[in-house]
């Protein structure tokens, strides 16, 4: 497991672990204006997360009032909870649109006061697979998104306060624009990022085709298929919820689409902890028709 995620492994509640991940994970790429984890956590951030892990009822109630099946909205809800509860942060606005007549120019993810200072924070949690050695060839598993598109969009969003149509709350004229990026990047064996903006310390995994040999770190590890809303933080599971490598391969033999899998080993308390993760994709991935639609957008 990445050293930066070891603290997350101490947390047993999945939503609390996901929240800690969103606040502390290394960014997949450098935006140039990344907010520090220390500033988001504040002086008592980790004790507050431990207390929330001991009794996650308030966070669970917050999420229950905001049900979603979309990972991005789930992540936004988690961050919204933290920004509404952390004593050093004031949540002023979330998802505030900027409209120029009938045209929506963009949307502020969060407008915050952190230790009294106004901040525009753009947040994103992304998962991309490296197709080949081309610098921009990091694409989403569904081939509807790509890193280069998000990279350019984020750069634009971070300047949103400068747009003539932007209407900011009182006291935000001198705001600071920052980003909080999280997510995972997945690479074929023996490949590495090629774009200088990619963070070499990012959370990384592998990807391979279903019929290939799957990378395995330990001969006695167990495996777990991760639903989309469990993609954020490193997985934990009881042994009964896991499978052997052979059983997992058999289960996915006829499965459709990419599947995200976690490889796990038991810790000293008998909890199976993620040690690696990767996408297993069909032999036909990437689908030519979807890739053919995506690639021209990358070249634009």
Regions found by a protein language model. Name each.
Residues 1-300:
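Intrinsically disordered, low-complexity Ser/Thr/Pro/Gly-rich regulatory segments
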């Amino acid at each position: 497991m990445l050293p930066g995620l070891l603290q997350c492994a101490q947390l047993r509640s999945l939503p609390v672990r996901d929240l800690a991940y969103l606040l502390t994970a290394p960014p997949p790429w450098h935006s140039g204006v990344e907010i520090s984890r220390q500033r988001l956590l504040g002086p008592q951030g980790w004790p507050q997360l431990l207390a929330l892990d001991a009794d996650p009822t308030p966070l669970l109630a917050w999420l229950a009032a905001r049900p979603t099946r979309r990972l991005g909205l789930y992540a936004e809800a988690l961050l919204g909870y933290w920004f509404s509860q952390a004593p050093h942060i004031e949540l002023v606005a979330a998802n505030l649109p900027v409209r120029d007549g009938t045209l929506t120019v963009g949307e502020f993810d969060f407008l915050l006061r952190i230790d009294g200072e106004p901040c525009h924070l753009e947040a994103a949690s992304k998962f991309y697979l490296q197709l080949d050695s081309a610098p921009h060839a990091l694409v989403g598993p569904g081939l509807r998104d790509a890193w280069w598109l998000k990279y350019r969009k984020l750069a634009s969003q971070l300047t949103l306060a400068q747009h003539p149509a932007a209407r900011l709350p009182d006291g935000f004229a001198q705001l600071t624009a920052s980003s909080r990026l999280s997510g995972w990047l997945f690479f074929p064996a023996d490949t590495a990022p090629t774009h200088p903006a990619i963070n070499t310390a990012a959370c990384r995994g592998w990807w391979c085709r279903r019929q290939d040999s799957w990378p395995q770190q330990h001969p006695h590890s167990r495996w777990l298929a991760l639903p989309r809303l469990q993609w954020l933080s490193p997985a934990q599971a009881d042994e009964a919820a896991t499978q052997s490598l052979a059983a997992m391969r058999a289960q996915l033999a006829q499965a459709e689409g990419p599947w995200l899998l976690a490889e796990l080993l038991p810790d000293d308390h008998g909890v199976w902890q993620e040690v690696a993760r990767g996408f297993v994709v069909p032999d036909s991935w990437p689908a030519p028709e979807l890739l053919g639609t995506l690639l021209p957008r990358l070249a634009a």
